């Protein structure tokens, strides 16, 4: 999923990339015209006839491309969940077992105060020029192997049954990508995201307060 917050005119175009491929995109113009193309993450996680293995690391490189005509700062909100066959979230199952390895030595930072077990908020601290793509904010995904130890015991008519808690559930990751202009970025970010930041005089870098 790719959503947007825009705080200025001109043309905002950003794309969410997964392992180099466009998953979602959104175009926004000063005339309040929007074109949104939503996609789904993790659909290409497994190879043909490959079975998923808890504990194994799978390639999951997420990045953002600025395909608009103005420079922007971007943030990404990732939400992890377990869902049943009908797509209903089960909030009693732990999103912590869905592990993305975040890369924070390349300009991305995790906003700890805005992050929960279910939701991770990341900011790219450098301006993304028109036409450029950020470095990957993550590189791998794995499911904690202790998922196999999560069992429920039931007793009926002297018969004991053990059932894996996560049977019948699939894991999901939703990504929301937001962008604001670099011009007057401090005020634009506060207005659009409600976040206080420091912005360099040349408006090429920012940091959380």
Report the location of each language-model feature:
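C-terminal, structured domain-capping segment
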Residues: 50-82, 128-209
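Generic structural "secondary-structure junction" signal
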Residues: 4, 18-19, 54, 182
